Amino acid sequence: MIKKTLLSFTILANCTFLFAAEVDHYSVPAKLIPNSSALVYEKVQNYLQMALNEANVLSSCNEDILYKKMRLYFNNHTKGKLTQDVIYDEGFPSVRIKLEESIFQDWSIYNGFLLGREKAKKSALALGPIMKIDNQVLGTDKLEHFFGSGFLYFKRHHKNGTDLLKVLKRGAFYEKTILGGNFLATGVFSYADLAANFNGMRFWNHVLQKDDDVLGAEENLGPYVSCEQGQWVQVKEINLAEYLDDSFDESKNCSKFATSRGYEKYTSRLKLIEGLRGVDFNCLSSTENNSYLTEKYQSRLRNGDPIHHWIINQNGHEQVSYFNEF
């Protein structure tokens, strides 16, 4: 029994660090977060061209090779050059918040081991930087989810034909376990991560645009790449702003927590920050914002659920339910 528990913990620890752990959307005002759009788009353009060139050397419009080469640059921090640049380059325009000065400063190993342990204070992955792209504030971890988990969603639904509801359920299961929302991981169940995963799936589908967008054909943004005379060529520039919205922002698309004590610590610290900054961060306070997001993601799944049911938190901060959350 002890061996099984240790094995489960080891698996959780290794899988969780495939992604930067958490972010703090509260401690620094949005106006103080530098806009990194120009640099991000320059890197996106350069890395896409590098991927196309490398794919063209190896084949004549082979899709699997194209995706393989693109994922060398667009992936999580263990594999993707873009996310590595964003997370590890201290000169990259973003804001880095020390764990001991963040909303998670009261966290203990009992609230979320990977975020509460002493080593987390020295880890670049414990608390990801906050950045701004086209005036949308997001954590750098959301780029990892967008490109990394987004590709897995894309592969399951668009490549393998798995029903979208099953794909979203699987994503929620992973978020509850190996990707955060478990007290052996960070203890934070992030709806914003799920929103980034979903929109990343849309992005990867748009690369070649072989299927209509899951939100409707009117949302088709691709193709970005096309096969011409046996070579992959870029036919449209990638505009990340067309995917980013407030569902990526954890101060507006609230997270839930693995333990009741973690929930209490988080919300208590949030009240202190609100008092210091004179801001109400209640993610349910903006009816206009909620209406916009629920309308955008209103497409129905086969069981009748709107997509927003799986990626937008409409209940506010609370302890996550492991069996009845959805």
Residue positions per predicted region:
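N-terminal secretory signal peptides that target proteins for export/translocation
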Residues: M1-I2
